[in-house]
């Protein structure tokens, strides 16, 4: 009995203590909740009631999760659809949500400068896409690799070892050889048939030049074509390169809905794998053999970009770069060379043949600066201001692509008063910047004179981002000097050495863009004739 009474008493005491503890815990929780609520209330009261969180840039309302992807799939090419949205909304900055990604499009130079000058470091990354992963061998390169240690490493190598002013001067002879080869090749085409396909010719000149700088040779074939033109191997390589360029940032559905990667719903993945494999087929044997030669001591002199990549050492004296880094970086740089210069020269020639007065002025300038007793050289470029004004106008009015490569926001920010969330992909519109009527009078008219300034030398770069020739900022073009040399020398040699007219029964070029990209709808074909003494034309070597 005493035992029962004692146990009952203990249970009563325990229950009382438990009840007291629960009450105290509940009170403590309530006190904490009240305190947090008061703090939040005070913070809200202290906040400026008129200060609102900035809105996203204007844009269409999409579906949950998938955003505007259904509309995107029906609206090809996507770049025209995005520009039509901006036109409908009458805005110079817009936001279109694709999956969970905010795609921000910009056509205003002032906003572009805010992004690439004032907030450049914040927009220094690239998106993760299937195409990039394939081309960069798992993000080991410079141009298309997202921001991080690997990007910094490769960017430093490219900027300090490959495209610095000293290297540019050092490789002058190789560029000069390709300028002469272009003149010899065009001479042979003019003498044999008179007809020249400018798209084919300009692309392969640029391809020859970058191959010479990269590998020390202009061709992937053991045998060269007698007239100086590309071989079957070179043509296959060039076609694969341009196919890859067309699909590197092509609004692939799996880039916005990653769970669809592998299904290849729009065929982009197969195209990228095949085109990348073709380029690797030509690049990799040369790279592997060269690495072996350096390792065995059979090659000790640096003669081209590939030698530079292989010979760079780290602080311990070991090779800084692996083959897995060298191969995709070379592929990336080779791809970066041909499209922009070749497109500008083809459009410039098309515009000039429709406006003979511009063509006449350009040839008069070359004759005045250079004469007809020698060939134009890179040293003449500073004085060829009208020729460069023509090229600036071609870059402005006829950009090689509708948008620059995407810039990814590394954190939340505000641009032009609008909220830009972390991870947003910002697309600067080459098309919209160059044709912005608030910036350019009569923007659809080809007027080289608008770029002339008596007080200064004309350059192809555009630092104020009123148009984009060679992009700027941390992710800008690494080699504007090389781009300027290739583009200007190509046009100058074609104008100095030859007169040009349209084929028989054609009176003007139809200046129409392709239905799926920004290239001229039909490749420009013209008939040439010699305008210099024959002894000045180089021979194919």
UniProtKB/Swiss-Prot annotation:
Binding-site list for heme = 477
SUPFAM superfamilies linked to this entry: Cytochrome P450
- Tell me which UniProt keywords the record has, alphabetically: Heme, Iron, Membrane, Metal-binding, Monooxygenase, NADP, Oxidoreductase, Transmembrane, Transmembrane helix
Cite the Pfam families for this sequence: p450
Entry cofactors = heme
Catalytic reaction annotation: L-tryptophan + 2 reduced [NADPH--hemoprotein reductase] + 2 O2 = (E)-(indol-3-yl)acetaldehyde oxime + 2 oxidized [NADPH--hemoprotein reductase] + CO2 + 3 H2O + 2 H(+)
Cross-referenced InterPro entries, in alphabetical order?
A: Cyt_P450, Cyt_P450_CS, Cyt_P450_E_grp-I, Cyt_P450_sf
A molecular function annotated in GO for this UniProt entry is: tryptophan N-monooxygenase activity
UniProt tissue specificity: Found in all tissues tested. Highest expression in roots, and low expression in stem.
Locate the transmembrane regions by residue number. Answer: 21-41
Does Membrane count among this protein's keywords? yes
Task: Give the Enzyme Commission number.
Answer: 1.14.14.156
Mention one GO biological process in which this protein takes part, according to its record.
indoleacetic acid biosynthetic process
Protein family: Belongs to the cytochrome P450 family.
Q: What exactly does this protein do?
A: Converts tryptophan to indole-3-acetaldoxime, a precursor for tryptophan-derived glucosinolates and indole-3-acetic acid (IAA). Involved in the biosynthetic pathway to 4-hydroxyindole-3-carbonyl nitrile (4-OH-ICN), a cyanogenic metabolite required for inducible pathogen defense.
Name of protein: Tryptophan N-monooxygenase 1
Organism name:
Arabidopsis thaliana
Upper taxonomic classification of the species?
Eukaryota, Viridiplantae, Streptophyta, Embryophyta, Tracheophyta
Gene name per UniProt? CYP79B2
């Amino acid at each position: 009995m005493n035992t029962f009474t004692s146990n009952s008493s203990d249970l009563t005491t325990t229950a009382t203590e438990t009840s007291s503890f629960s009450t105290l815990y509940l009170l403590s929780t309530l006190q904490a909740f009240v305190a947090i609520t008061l703090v939040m209330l005070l913070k809200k009261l202290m906040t400026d009631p008129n200060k609102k969180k900035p809105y996203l840039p204007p844009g269409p309302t999409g579906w949950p999760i998938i955003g505007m992807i259904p509309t995107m799939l029906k609206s090809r090419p996507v770049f025209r659809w995005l520009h039509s949205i901006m036109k409908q909304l009458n805005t110079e900055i817009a936001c279109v949500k694709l999956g969970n990604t905010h795609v921000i499009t910009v056509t205003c130079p002032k906003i572009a400068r805010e992004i690439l000058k004032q907030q450049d470091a914040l927009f220094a990354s690239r998106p993760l896409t299937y195409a990039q992963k394939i081309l960069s061998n798992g993000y080991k390169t410079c141009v298309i690799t997202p921001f991080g240690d690997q990007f910094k490493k490769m960017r430093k190598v490219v900027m300090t070892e490959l495209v610095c002013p000293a290297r540019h001067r050092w490789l002058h002879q190789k560029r000069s050889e390709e300028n002469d080869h272009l003149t010899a090749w065009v001479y042979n085409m003019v003498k044999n048939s008179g007809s020249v396909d400018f798209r084919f010719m300009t692309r392969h000149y640029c391809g020859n030049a970058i191959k010479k700088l990269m590998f020390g040779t202009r061709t992937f074939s053991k045998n060269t074509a007698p007239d100086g033109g590309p071989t079957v191997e070179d043509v296959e390589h060039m076609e694969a390169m341009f196919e890859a360029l067309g699909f590197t940032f092509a609004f692939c559905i799996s880039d916005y809905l990653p769970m669809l990667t592998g299904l290849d719903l729009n065929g982009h993945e197969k195209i990228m794998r095949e085109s990348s494999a073709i380029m690797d087929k030509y690049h990799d044997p040369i790279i592997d053999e060269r690495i072996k030669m350096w390792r065995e001591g059979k090659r000790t002199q640096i003669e081209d970009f590939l030698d530079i990549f292989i010979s760079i050492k780290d602080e311990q004296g070991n090779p800084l770069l692996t083959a897995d880094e060298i191969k995709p970086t070379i592929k990336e740089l080779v791809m970066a060379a041909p499209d922009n210069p070749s497109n500008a020269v083809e459009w410039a020639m098309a515009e000039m043949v429709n406006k003979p007065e511009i063509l006449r002025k350009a040839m008069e300038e070359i004759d005045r600066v250079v004469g007809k007793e020698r060939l134009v050289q890179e040293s003449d470029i500073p004085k060829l201001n009208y020729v460069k004004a023509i090229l600036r106008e071609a870059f402005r009015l006829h950009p090689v692509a509708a948008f620059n490569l995407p810039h990814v926001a590394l954190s939340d920010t505000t641009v032009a008063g609008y909220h830009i969330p972390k991870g947003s992909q910002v697309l600067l519109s080459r098309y919209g910047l160059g044709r912005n009527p608030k910036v350019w009078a009569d923007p659809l008219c080809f007027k080289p004179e608008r770029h002339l300034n008596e007080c200064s030398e004309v350059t192809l770069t555009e630092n104020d981002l009123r148009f984009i020739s060679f992009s700027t900022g941390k992710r800008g073009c690494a080699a504007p000097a090389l781009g300027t040399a290739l583009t200007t020398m190509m046009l100058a040699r074609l104008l100095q050495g030859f007169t040009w007219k349209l084929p028989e029964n054609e009176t003007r070029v139809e200046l129409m863009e392709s239905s799926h990209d920004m290239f001229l709808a039909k490749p420009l074909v013209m008939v040439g004739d010699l305008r210099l003494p024959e002894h000045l034309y180089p021979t194919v070597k």
